[in-house]
Amino acid sequence: IFTSEELGNYGFYNSIVSYFALFAMLGISIYGTKQIAASRDVSSTFWNIYIIQVITSGIAIVIYFFIIKLIPGMSGMIPLILAISLFGKLVDISWLFSGKEDFKKITIRNGIVKLAGVLSIFTFINSQDQLYLYVFFLVIFDFLGQLVMWVPARKFLRKPTFNKEIIKTHIKPTVMLFLPQVAISLYVVLDRTLLGVLG
C-alpha cells in the first residue's frame, strides 16, 4: 500500500533511531541477564544496573529530540513517533526475565504485541497517506509490551536501593559489551542511513 519512497524514508528514520536505541541499552541486555542469573540479591542487582539504563536512555532521548529539531531532514511526524521506541528502551526490563530464565513471559508478550500490531494495521490503515499510523502501531504496541512487563517483575523486586560503588563496577562491563554491538549495528543499518543521507 505504501510506495518504495515512503518505506525508504521510514527505513532511514528507523536506522537513525536504532543508533540511539543501541546507546540507550549500552550492552545491558547481555550484561544484565548474566548478572541477574548469578545474583543472590536480584532486586539490588537489578536496580543498580537499571539506573544506568535510565541515565543512558535519558541521554539518548534528549539528544534525539535535539537532532530532529536541528536537522531539516529529520523533521516531520514519523521521526517524532519513532521516539516512542526510545521510551520503550527506557522501560525495557526483558533482561530481568532472561536472567531468571522466565522466557515464557517474554514469548507471550512478544506474541501479543505482534498480533495487536498486525490486527491494528489491517483494521485501521486503508490509504497510502497513513504511513505515520503504520509506524505508530509498530512502536506503541512495543512500548506497551515493555511497560506491562513491570507487573510480573514485582515478584522479583523490592523498593529501589542504589549503591554508587556497585553502580560504578557495572559501567565498564556494559560499555565493553556495547562496543561490539555498535560494530554489528553499523554493518546492518549503515547502508540505510547512507542511502537516506545521500538520497
Residue ranges of predicted features:
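Helix-terminus/linker motif at the lipid-water interface of multi-pass membrane proteins
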Residues: 1-7, 123-127, 185-199
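Membrane-interface helix-loop junctions in multi-pass transport and translocation proteins
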Residues: 3-7, 66, 70-78, 100-105, ...
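Membrane-water interface segments that mark the loop-to-transmembrane alpha-helix transition
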Residues: 13, 18-69
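Residue-level recognition of pore/gate-forming positions within transmembrane alpha-helices
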Residues: 15-18, 53, 57, 86, ...
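Alpha-helical transmembrane segments of multi-pass membrane proteins
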Residues: 19-23, 66-97, 143-144
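Membrane-embedded alpha-helical segments of multi-pass transporters/permeases
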Residues: 23-26, 61-69, 81, 118-123, ...
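Membrane-interface junctions at transmembrane-helix termini in multi-pass inner-membrane proteins
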Residues: 34-40, 76, 86-110
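Interhelical loop/hinge segments that connect adjacent transmembrane helices in multipass membrane
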Residues: 104-109, 131-133, 137-138, 147-189, ...
